[in-house]
Amino acid sequence: INYTSGTTSYSKGVMIPYRALWSNTQFAFDVLKMNPGDKLVSMLPMAHMYGLAFEFLYEFCVGCHIYFLTRTPSPKIIFQAFSEVKPNLVVAVPLIIEKIIKKNVLPKLETPAMKILLKVPIINDKIKATVREQMINAFGGNFYEIIVGGAAFNQEIEQFLKSIDFPYTVGYGMTECAPIICYEDWKYFKLGSCGKAAPRMEVKILSPDPENIVGEIVCKGPNVMLGYYNNPEATAEVIDKDGWLHTGDLGVMDAEGNVTIKGRSKNMLLGPSGQNIYPEEIEDKLNNMPFVSESIIIQQADSKLAALVYPDFDDAFAHGLDNDAITQAMEENRINLNTELPAYSQIARVKIYPEEFEKTPKKSIKRFLYQEVK
């Protein structure tokens, strides 16, 4: 029994059968490229299915060396561990990758001189090749690919990685599937997607036009749980009579089977005329703005949208901003963000949080704790 992360509600005990553990481990044997004696740095908690399946069970069955990171995975600690271990595969959540790139890579590319050089095609290619090599070396220089999963990946960061042909891929799964649902090798991975249905799994979108109209993602196969422990009502809500697991995630699927997630159905908000608003898409834009570490978009009692923001205080203070200046910077971000949004999803106010938002073991924000602006 493995307990869900609890991003939209409190945790439930997921009953995971042997077939699901076998299917996930066999998936890893089918598509990952590890051999006996290979190395991996384990950064994810073993109490979470993502970490248990792909940072322990698979490697244990192959005969790999697993190095457990026993400290909080800051960029400095990760770089040190990877330089010593030189892992053959990297499994991570988006937050870890995003922090490394935001802190150590993007600032160097955003200097005035570098922006000018990047406009020259030949120099641009050379700079990107150099950045790619430095990034690969930062993760030990010996891995086949980085698998990112467990939460939504920042679009700007993903576009940057794709532009330098960095060997990364984004998977999709949930505790209820122990965890894998979708995956694609980095060489064939489509930007913005989370891959295709994993071996032995079926995936479809409940939509009249799955390529263009967002619908709920449902899946079926040996990875699917038996149900929630001592909770038949909750089980019946997510597994229908035909055995399809209703994930609660919303997305589209192209003709090749690539799935793109738009957000959680429980997170979706309604605009003044019934328009669908996906807070994750707005948060993705806001998180790329100056001095923003993380954010949550919520709907207030008056139906207007508010942004809860945890600023990147270290970066702001390093640039000489005091608390009043940070507040002003967040208001400027709100104004600039609204120029990129349709009228029905404009942000009415910003509330600054002094501490990081509470998260699940896989570093997803526990959104249900922050549904009111105080």
Question: Which sequence ranges carry the predicted segments?
Answer:
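Conserved S/T- and glycine-rich ATP-binding loop of Class I adenylate-forming
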Residues: 4-7, 40, 90, 161, ...
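Conserved ATP-binding/catalytic segment of the ANL
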Residues: 197, 204, 211-271
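Conserved AMP-binding/adenylation subdomain of ANL enzymes
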Residues: 22-39, 46-133, 142, 167
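Conserved A3 ("GATE") glycine/threonine-rich loop of ANL adenylate-forming enzymes
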Residues: 95, 149-157, 170-185, 198-200, ...
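AMP-binding/adenylate-forming catalytic core of the ANL superfamily
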Residues: 221, 226-227, 250-343
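Active-site loops of AMP-binding adenylate-forming
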Residues: 18, 153, 162-166, 174-192, ...
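Flexible lysine-rich "adenylation lid" loop at the C-terminal edge of ANL adenylation domains
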Residues: 310, 353-373
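Conserved AMP-binding A3 loop
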Residues: 1-23
